[in-house]
């Protein structure tokens, strides 16, 4: 299963030197859900979340949570990357732009439940948090990172866009926000387990 083949995943993006992974993870899930519902892939603005969701507890380039980003999107709607491009920095004020991409709800997947996550990913790309401060992850280029080496201290928002099996190991196909030169064209395979 690979949502890229269904045309509901935008190209790999690069957050640069801004701690905004949470916004890329959230917009990736929104882009997928919107494309599936409307049969149209739109590139949703991460910058809007960075600049405008502070009252929801997000801190722009200093971190944030995908849940808060989804709450903001439901309350205020979203705009496109074309209308509000990513700048890899935050602004004090929320820019005034047309926000015409609406969402009515989001569903939280049970933590540490592989079956629930598998069911969710079979419906659309899913926003998740992982531990990315390990050298194994940072210098990943191919293969499957196994559960033993994954880590459990979440510090990075990413997007699951599919799943499969490689050399007998079940994996999640994960889109990162460190540009297409990182990993395997911007993607990583993480072993599929309950953690």
Language-model features, listed with the residues they occupy:
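Catalytic-core signature of thiol
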Residues: 1-195
């Amino acid at each position: 299963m690979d949502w890229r083949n269904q045309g509901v995943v935008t190209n790999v993006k690069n957050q640069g030197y801004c701690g905004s992974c949470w916004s890329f993870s959230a917009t990736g899930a929104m882009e997928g859900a919107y494309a599936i519902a409307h049969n149209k892939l739109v590139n949703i603005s991460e910058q809007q979340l960075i600049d405008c969701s502070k009252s929801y507890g997000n801190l722009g380039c200093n971190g944030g949570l995908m849940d808060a980003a989804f709450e903001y999107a439901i309350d205020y709607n979203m705009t496109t990357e074309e209308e509000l491009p990513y700048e890899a920095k935050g602004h004090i004020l929320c820019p005034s732009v047309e926000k015409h991409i609406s969402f009515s709800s989001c569903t939280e997947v049970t933590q540490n439940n592989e079956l629930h996550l598998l069911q969710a990913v079979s419906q659309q790309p899913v926003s998740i948090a992982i531990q990315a401060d390990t050298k194994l992850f940072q210098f990943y280029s191919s293969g499957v990172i196994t559960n033993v080496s994954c880590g459990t201290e979440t510090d990075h928002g990413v997007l699951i866009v599919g799943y499969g099996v490689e050399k007998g190991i079940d994996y999640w196909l994960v889109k990162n926000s460190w540009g297409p030169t990182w990993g395997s064209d911007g993607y990583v395979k993480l072993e599929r387990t309950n953690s």
